[in-house]
Regions:
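Domain-level signature for soluble enzymes in the chorismate/prephenate branch of the shikimate pathway
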Residues: 1-92
Length: 92
C-alpha cells in the first residue's frame, strides 16, 4: 500500500471521527444545560477518571493505550472549555 492510499484511509476515518465528535458535543450541550439547571460544576474528576479507565480497557493493542487515553483526556478538556464558555455566556 502506498502513502497516498494510507492517507486516503486516514482522511475517511477523520470524516467519521468528526461526525462522532459532533454527536458527542451535542450531548455535551445537554450536559451543560443540566449543570446550569442544577448548579453542578463543569469539572467532575471522578467521571473523567472513570472515562479514562473505561477507555483504557477498550483499547485492544497495548501500544496504543496511552495515546488513546491522552486523546480522550484532550477531548474532555475541550468539552470542559466549551461548557465553561457556554455557562459564562449564559450568565451575561
Amino acid at each position: 500500500m502506498d502513502l497516498d492510499m494510507i492517507r486516503s484511509q486516514i482522511n475517511q476515518l477523520d470524516e467519521e471521527l468528526v461526525a462522532l465528535l459532533e454527536k458527542r458535543m451535542e450531548l455535551v450541550d445537554q450536559v451543560t444545560a443540566y449543570k446550569r439547571a442544577t448548579g453542578k460544576p463543569v469539572l467532575d474528576t471522578s467521571r473523567e477518571n472513570a472515562v479514562l479507565e473505561r477507555v483504557g480497557k477498550l483499547v485492544q493493542k497495548d501500544d496504543y493505550r496511552s495515546a488513546i487515553q491522552a486523546t480522550f483526556s484532550d477531548i474532555m478538556a475541550q468539552s470542559r472549555t466549551y461548557q465553561s464558555s457556554k455557562l459564562a455566556n449564559h450568565e451575561q
